[in-house]
Amino acid sequence: MQGLSFTFSAVTLFLVLCLQLGIIESQDDENVRKPLLIEIDVPSTAQENQEITVQVTVETQYRECMVIKAYLVSNEPMEGAFNYVQTRCLCNDHPIRFFWDIIITRTVTFATVIDIVREKNICPNDMAVVPITANRYYTYNTVRMN
C-alpha cells in the first residue's frame, strides 16, 4: 500500500509541474497578438512655413477587423489638415496609411493618437471588435524649426 501512495504522490507532483509549465507558457507575452502596430514617419526638422507630411502606418495582428480613429493633438494651436480626424476599418493583412500635411511655423510637439472605437457603417457588415485591455494608443513626436 505504501508503494501505491508513493506512485500517487509522484503522479500528482508530475501533474502539478505540467500544469504550472502550461500556465507559464500561456502567459508568455510573445505569443499574444497585438491589437495595433504603429509606425510613424515624420521629419525631425523643418524650415519656417515649410509643409511637412506626417505619415502613420497602422496594422493589426488580430484576425478580426476593428474601427480606428486617427488624429493629431498638439501643445500649440495648429490649423488645416492637422485637425482632421480620420476613421477607417483596419483588418489583418491590410495595413492602413494615414497622411496629414501640416505647415510648421514654430517648433511643435504633437501626439499621434489612434483610438479603437465602436462605430457603425465603417467595417463590412458592422463586424468589428474592440479589445478589453486598451483602446487608445499614442506616441509623441517633435518637429524642430530650423
From Swiss-Prot:
One CC-aspect GO term: apical plasma membrane
Record gene name: Pip
Main location: secreted
InterPro entries: Ig-like_fold (IPR013783), Ig_E-set (IPR014756), PIP (IPR007990)
SS bond list: C65-C91, C89-C123
Signal peptide location: 1-26
Family statement: Belongs to the PIP family.
Localization per Swiss-Prot or TrEMBL: Secreted
GO biological process, one term: regulation of immune system process
Gene3D superfamilies reported in the protein's UniProt record: Immunoglobulins (2.60.40.10)
UniProt keyword terms in alphabetical order: Disulfide bond, Pyrrolidone carboxylic acid, Secreted, Signal
Tissue specificity note: Lacrimal and submaxillary glands.
Name recorded for this polypeptide: Prolactin-inducible protein homolog
Assembly: Monomer. Interacts with AZGP1.
UniProt modified residues of type Pyrrolidone carboxylic acid: Q27
